[in-house]
């Protein structure tokens, strides 16, 4: 096989495994970002995704984690629940792992601020999408307003949000 063909083949492989989508689930602390992303992980696993990288995933939906799932027919998806201040290095490490594992999409939690100094999780995620020319979307959880909607189950709202994130992954 001529060298040019190998180069073209490697270029095509890189193109097929480049980051295409970055979804930022943003919001203030205690708004359900981590539980929603745990529900998204469970939803993807129910769609036959397999975990190929696991850093801290447990059945505790309030426990931060980072996983990479291989979703049949789609490819690898990185899901990062670290979004609080002080987690910037963990988020950057997770993004590097996503690149190394050929993720097509990344979904990450973040507080809402986009400050340049120091770089926030939001800025790190946003800049990551921009650097890789990915389709980048920010969204929020569905928030139950205080004082009304007492009968609304927050798990139901988080499940609806997780289903919306799943649709964004597939249709964005």
Task: Please annotate each region the language model reported.
Residues 42-55:
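Post-Walker A helix-loop "phosphate-sensing" segment adjacent to the P-loop in P-loop NTPases
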Residues 22-44:
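Glycine-rich phosphate-binding P-loop
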Residues 52-111:
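Conserved nucleotide-sensing/catalytic segment adjacent to the nucleotide-binding pocket
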Residues 13-21:
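Pre-Walker A-like glycine/lysine-rich segment at the N-terminus of P-loop NTPase domains
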Residues 20-24, 105-107:
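Residue-level preference for the first positions of well-ordered beta-strands
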Residues 13, 35-37, 89-91, 116-123:
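A short acidic (Asp/Glu
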